Amino acid sequence: MKINYPLLALAIGAFGIGTTEFSPMGLLPVIARGVDVSIPAAGMLISAYAVGVMVGAPLMTLLLSHRARRSALIFLMAIFTLGNVLSAIAPDYMTLMLSRILTSLNHGAFFGLGSVVAASVVPKHKQASAVATMFMGLTLANIGGVPAATWLGETIGWRMSFLATAGLGVISMVSLFFSLPKGGAGARPEVKKELAVLMRPQVLSALLTTVLGAGAMFTLYTYISPVLQSITHATPVFVTAMLVLIGVGFSIGNYLGGKLADRSVNGTLKGFLLLLMVIMLAIPFLARNEFGAAISMVVWGAATFAVVPPLQMRVMRVASEAPGLSSSVNIGAFNLGNALGAAAGGAVISAGLGYSFVPVMGAIVAGLALLLVFMSARKQPETVCVANS
């Protein structure tokens, strides 16, 4: 099989970004001790990263949209590398917080511009698969990068974890430099015109679908450990094993979602959102034993990430006049869904409904996303996305 080097370079960048985004979750106690703060305070580093993604996605895309995409992507990975180096040498909590925010500024714009580049280096009928290939780096980070960074942080120190992640940034920059076509600098964008594109009803509908799709995922994912402990009576070792299986499911779903979205974006969204609803409604029953829990986590992970490539392609299609900005904003929408999903799951727990109802709430959110897809599909027939290089 012929290797598509531009897609490989984008996947390497995605792997690094996924590693730096998720690895602090497993290192919070170590980081908290290192900068002399409480674990909840250290948890704010994760929230700050998410906020930085939402702010940085449109901001960095607009600032870099007149530059050649290769140089823009390399610049974004330079920010990533610098942010991780500064995190590794941060002398105190506030410096670490600012370093994490700096690191996050590349996230949305990289995936947004990267999606456009990925779609431009393959034939039109393979664009969704190309976008999925880039996101495969993100899913593989959950299987390999995050556990490796966590192990490194636990054994050598959390600072070494950030330094190693910075090394991934250097590898990514070199890969992008040698694999992507140079391209010329584009015209400076008309900001008002591109923002007007985002205000179209069909674009807002697509972005809202992304928020709800991500919200369904994070309603459960945020509380996966206590949910499994409550339903399955899982040990910490078993929970860790389930997180690995979820990562495997992410990779399977990402691949299937990309392949099927090449045929039909809306059809893929309908099918996997329905599967996501069904499996989350079934988890309170299936996960009562370890085997059922393992099967549930793989299927749930696959259904969850299978909607990512079609959601990204859907926004790029309905906002084809501003593909870079729209796809970057869509990454911000994923992070907004992250926050809303965590809030929805937290509301269930705070209301005393029990951890078994958390996946049910996720199914309700997925149902809202599915309803929105059906409504939008009636008004907006599928069109072919043309990504210009």
Curated annotation (Swiss-Prot):
Belongs to the major facilitator superfamily. The keyword Transmembrane applies. This is Inner membrane transport protein YdhP. Residues 1-6, 65-70, 122-130, 181-203, 258-266, 312-330, 378-389 are cytoplasmic. Keywords: Cell inner membrane, Cell membrane, Membrane, Transmembrane, Transmembrane helix, Transport. GO terms for molecular function: transmembrane transporter activity. Pfam families: MFS_1 (PF07690). GO terms for biological process: transmembrane transport. It is a multi-pass membrane protein. One of its GO terms (cellular component) is plasma membrane. PROSITE patterns: MFS. It is found in: Cell inner membrane. The lineage of its organism: Bacteria, Pseudomonadati, Pseudomonadota, Gammaproteobacteria, Enterobacterales. Residues 28-43, 92-100, 152-159, 225-236, 288-290, 352-356 are periplasmic. The chain crosses the membrane at residues 7-27, 44-64, 71-91, 101-121, 131-151, 160-180, 204-224, 237-257, 267-287, 291-311, 331-351, 357-377. The keyword Cell wall biogenesis/degradation does not apply. The gene is ydhP.
